[in-house]
């Protein structure tokens, strides 16, 4: 059986000005394709490797064609296409209208189409490549897919992280069981680890580079480079020199997990008073502080010996090292 995994915009270019203007950073980025043949992973490629466009989010036609050619396959040889939908409103609408499913079946005439949730894709990627038989899994980033309407507002909710348990058993069912979800509601989603780091990185980067004439990272699509650069800048600052409201407050315990609520501070105004190096250090400290708080309070009945991290926030190697140091 040939299974093709796809992530990327279908039916639009992934970066329509209307979407950028209305939704800010909610554009499709990092598209790519993966092939599994008879249960074995054969290829996994990002579109930007071929297009040479950083964070390319368009339909990954070059990646797909390379995979097909490499394995001597045609579009008709694909039995199943698994599509990971994004959290943009337009992709959500296209999925709901069955446009995406019909388009994929047009591209791959003999395939069935299934949709895979954003955070489940992250969770599977980290767990199934870990070698662990059993593990806690935390997938966390700015936001995931739209999931279901809020009882209060009727608006569709997006999770900014999911906590799961992975178990590699002989059974094919329930290998990854989601046990806790934190929803960030709708934009601007300030109670999201990833979104807060992203917003604060943008403010800090702009302060740091305001007098730099040749700034190579000014385009909308390049702003996803900011968090990594600010993480590196943190080593040069002192978080204790920054007196700002905490990112989160611990409002209550829900399902025996700490529930973190954003303080909704307007950091865009407050940041201007501080050195950007110190701001970077403060941001990193806040990220580590509340991530470690959450991971340290996993209920005992759910706690496993191993931990897998997935999603954009899992790229924060400084926080990852703290997790290892504290034996979480």
Which residues does each PLM region occupy?
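Short acidic/glycine-rich loops and adjacent helix/strand connectors
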Residues: 1-328
């Amino acid at each position: 059986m040939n299974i093709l995994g796809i992530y990327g915009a279908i039916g639009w270019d992934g970066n329509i000005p209307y979407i950028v203007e209305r939704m800010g950073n909610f554009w499709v980025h990092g598209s790519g394709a993966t092939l599994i043949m008879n249960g074995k992973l054969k290829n996994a490629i990002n579109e930007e490797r071929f297009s040479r466009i950083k964070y390319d989010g368009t339909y990954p036609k070059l990646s797909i064609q390379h995979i097909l050619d490499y394995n001597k396959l045609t579009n008709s040889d694909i039995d199943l296409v698994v599509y990971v939908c994004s959290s943009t409103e337009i992709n959500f609408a296209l999925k709901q209208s069955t446009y995406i499913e019909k388009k994929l079946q047009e591209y791959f005439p003999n395939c069935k189409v299934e949709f895979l949730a954003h955070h489940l894709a992250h969770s599977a990627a980290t767990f199934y490549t870990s070698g662990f038989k059993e593990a806690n899994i935390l997938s966390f980033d700015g936001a995931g897919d739209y999931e279901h309407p809020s009882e209060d507002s009727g608006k569709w909710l997006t999770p900014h992280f999911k906590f799961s348990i992975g178990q590699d058993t002989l059974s094919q069912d329930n290998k990854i069981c989601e046990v806790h979800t934190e929803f960030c509601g709708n934009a601007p989603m300030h109670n999201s680890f990833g979104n807060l780091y992203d917003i604060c990185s943008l403010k800090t980067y702009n302060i740091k580079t305001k007098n730099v004439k040749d700034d190579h990272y000014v385009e909308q699509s390049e702003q996803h480079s900011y968090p990594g650069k600010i993480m590196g800048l943190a080593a040069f600052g002192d978080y204790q020199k920054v007196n700002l409201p905490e990112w989160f407050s611990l409002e209550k315990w829900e399902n025996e997990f700490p529930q973190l609520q954003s303080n909704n501070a307007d950091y865009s105004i407050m940041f201007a008073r501080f050195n950007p190096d110190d701001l970077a250090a403060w941001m990193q400290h806040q990220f580590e502080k509340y991530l470690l708080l959450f991971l340290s309070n996993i209920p005992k009945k759910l706690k496993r010996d191993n931990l897998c991290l997935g999603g954009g926030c899992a790229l924060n190697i400084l926080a990852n090292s703290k997790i290892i140091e504290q034996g979480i």
